From Swiss-Prot:
It comes from the Bacteria. GO terms for biological process: ribosomal small subunit assembly; translation. HAMAP family: Ribosomal_uS19. GO terms for cellular component: cytoplasm; small ribosomal subunit. Protein S19 forms a complex with S13 that binds strongly to the 16S ribosomal RNA. InterPro entries: Ribosomal_uS19, Ribosomal_uS19_bac-type, Ribosomal_uS19_CS, Ribosomal_uS19_SF. Keywords: Ribonucleoprotein, Ribosomal protein, RNA-binding, rRNA-binding. One of its GO terms (molecular function) is rRNA binding. Belongs to the universal ribosomal protein uS19 family. This is Small ribosomal subunit protein uS19. Gene3D superfamilies: 30s Ribosomal Protein S19, Chain A.
Length: 92
């Protein structure tokens, strides 16, 4: 169930301060964050945010289409290596 519109988007305050500081100074360095639950807001457009996936920080360049999504959606936490091949099918 989506978040109520009357509540507004959730964004951690420490991340919001980092974003405002980066926009104000025009700094293009990636912003490191562990806050995967924060929603992408319009002031983040054009910034690179390094989102933690449990092992490393994944750089995410924020575009206009990402507004309203959460940062964690763009930093996958699991690696899929494929299913084991069926040995019987290979012999044929």
């Amino acid at each position: 169930m989506p978040r109520s519109l009357k509540k507004g988007p959730f964004i951690d305050l420490h991340l919001l301060k980092k974003v405002e500081k980066a926009v104000e100074s025009g700094d293009k360095k990636p912003l490191k964050t562990w806050s995967r639950r924060s929603m992408i807001i319009p002031t983040m457009i054009g910034l690179t945010i390094a989102v933690h996936n449990g092992r490393q920080h994944v750089p995410v360049f924020v575009t206009e289409e990402m507004i309203g999504h959460k940062l964690g959606e763009f930093a996958p936490t699991r690696t899929y290596r494929g299913h084991a091949a069926d040995k019987k099918a290979k012999k044929r």
